Amino acid sequence: MVDGVMILPVLMMMAFPSPSVEDEKPKVNQKLYMCVCEGLSCGNEDHCEGQQCFSSLSINDGFHVYQKGCFQVYEQGKMTCKTPPSPGQAVECCQGDWCNRNITAQLPTKGKSFPGTQNFHLEVGLIILSVVFAVCLLACILGVALRKFKRRNQERLNPRDVEYGTIEGLITTNVGDSTLAELLDHSCTSGSGSGLPFLVQRTVARQITLLECVGKGRYGEVWRGSWQGENVAVKIFSSRDEKSWFRETELYNTVMLRHENILGFIASDMTSRHSSTQLWLITHYHEMGSLYDYLQLTTLDTVSCLRIVLSIASGLAHLHIEIFGTQGKSAIAHRDLKSKNILVKKNGQCCIADLGLAVMHSQSTNQLDVGNNPRVGTKRYMAPEVLDETIQVDCFDSYKRVDIWAFGLVLWEVARRMVSNGIVEDYKPPFYDVVPNDPSFEDMRKVVCVDQQRPNIPNRWFSDPTLTSLAKLMKECWYQNPSARLTALRIKKTLTKIDNSLDKLKTDC
């Protein structure tokens, strides 16, 4: 049994029916209703305001858990409310002020497959008996077919799936003909939006089959998984990094992170198997892998280089800015930006991942939320003020300037792999020539703070106008004085200008 906050995980109820033409119209300006709010997710509030109200019932460790609340984003309500009830969970939705006050969700009766069959037993006569016989025969045929289908699926599951609980109690959902990508893109562009309400259920984890481990680190593993035939990424956090899982889950469920250059969020889940707890973060899957791995194998032309760095700058600018309104977001600083935490998409753009150390700030309340995570960022990418411990920890702008320093180092990594005049450098991490492979805090402090060294700029860059502009830009990210560094928005505008000048040059030619 997991204690404290860990008993009620933040899980997503995800069932995606095939959208009709009418469903595909955006529902941004839906009317808001006052709803009764009951359950742990409500805190001290007894009501909330959203576009739909709900009442849910789920079974957690043998206990019936009732919750009431509201969906603040229409697409979330649409996805959840159309989920058919299962033996372990049910949700009923409505629209109207306080409409969920007298609604209590009911679990389906065991073994009730065809609700209308009881009516047939009340009828008499030859015709009715014939219909009942036909229905029973059809049910038997379907039952045999489903059993064979389930047995075939179980034979395909590997031992890892057994360990993570994807066989026992497997719940399937009818998602029509729509793919996961289409439904997620329709509901949340390519980011997550804010997460679904805290409905206590285990649907998501039990529907995912883990296929292969694609990455390991000191804080956990990343697996390629399959959900209803679609690839997803499953990050399984180790117990030592529980705070990072909780932080990412909190961010994705409270902040509108809908952006094509932020890793798209699907669900967060927790399972307890064999006396151990697995913490899952389920996101979009990008088969190209991290920017770190991509640069080691791939050289870049001018267009692909600019596409990568501009997309990273766009994602960082979106994190840093605060957006006001009902569809707004708090300002966020990443605090661990590096090439390993940036993923490459099929279209050549990138998206920023791993928000486990992120800091949030709201201007309206002037509240700085640094979380409660003992983990620190990557030493190689630490800014001078972090290394010499002069950073103003109570100032949000300080954390944004730390991100800008790290962005400059990532920009340097990418620029080295851009071919100009037939010349290109091998991939190397920042400060590869002055610190060991796993530098200590003191190693980096001496190089960056005492000696004030910066990554070397090759001479060949100055014969290429694009690389010359990028070199100037990265130097403005590396000022020893944090307040002198560029902002993410200024970097984005500068890179856009460089990209536009390249397009103009091609047109003139």
Curated annotation (Swiss-Prot):
Residues with glycosylation annotation: 102
Residues in GS domain copies: 178-207
Topological domains, Cytoplasmic: 147-509
Compartments where located: Membrane
Transmembrane spans: 124-146
UniProt record, GO biological process: acute inflammatory response; atrial septum primum morphogenesis; atrioventricular valve morphogenesis; BMP signaling pathway; branching involved in blood vessel morphogenesis; cardiac muscle cell fate commitment; determination of left/right symmetry; embryonic heart tube morphogenesis
UniProt-annotated catalytic positions: 336 (proton acceptor)
Segments in the Extracellular topological domain: 21-123
Tissue specificity as recorded in UniProt: Highly expressed in bone during developmental stages. Expressed in normal parenchymal cells, endothelial cells, fibroblasts and tumor-derived epithelial cells.
Loss of function: phenotype: Deletion mutants show a recessive embryonic lethality. At 7.0 dpc, mutant embryos did not show any special abnormalities except a smaller size. However, at 8.0 dpc, mesoderm formation is initiated but its development is arrested around the mid/late streak stage. In an osteoblast-specific manner loss of BMP signaling via ACVR1 directs osteoblasts to increase endogenous bone mass. Additionally, mice lacking ACVR1 in cartilage show reduced SMAD responses, but also decreased p38 MAPK activation.
Catalytic activity: L-threonyl-[receptor-protein] + ATP = O-phospho-L-threonyl-[receptor-protein] + ADP + H(+); L-seryl-[receptor-protein] + ATP = O-phospho-L-seryl-[receptor-protein] + ADP + H(+)
E.C. number(s) listed in UniProt: 2.7.11.30
Top-level taxon of origin: Eukaryota
Sorted UniProt keywords: ATP-binding, Glycoprotein, Kinase, Magnesium, Manganese, Membrane, Metal-binding, Nucleotide-binding, Phosphoprotein, Receptor, Serine/threonine-protein kinase, Signal, Transferase, Transmembrane, Transmembrane helix
Record-listed ATP binding positions: 214-222, 235
Membrane association type: Single-pass type I membrane protein
Cleavable signal peptide: 1-20
Top EC class of this enzyme: transferase
Domain Protein kinase: from-to ranges: 208-502
Molecular-function annotations in GO: activin binding; activin receptor activity, type I; ATP binding; BMP receptor activity; cadherin binding; growth factor binding; metal ion binding; protein homodimerization activity
Role summary: Bone morphogenetic protein (BMP) type I receptor that is involved in a wide variety of biological processes, including bone, heart, cartilage, nervous, and reproductive system development and regulation. As a type I receptor, forms heterotetrameric receptor complexes with the type II receptors AMHR2, ACVR2A ors ACVR2B. Upon binding of ligands such as BMP7 or BMP9 to the heteromeric complexes, type II receptors transphosphorylate ACVR1 intracellular domain. In turn, ACVR1 kinase domain is activated and subsequently phosphorylates SMAD1/5/8 proteins that transduce the signal.
UniProt record similarity statement: Belongs to the protein kinase superfamily. TKL Ser/Thr protein kinase family. TGFB receptor subfamily.
Protein known as: Activin receptor type-1
Organism: Mus musculus (Mouse)
Gene: Acvr1
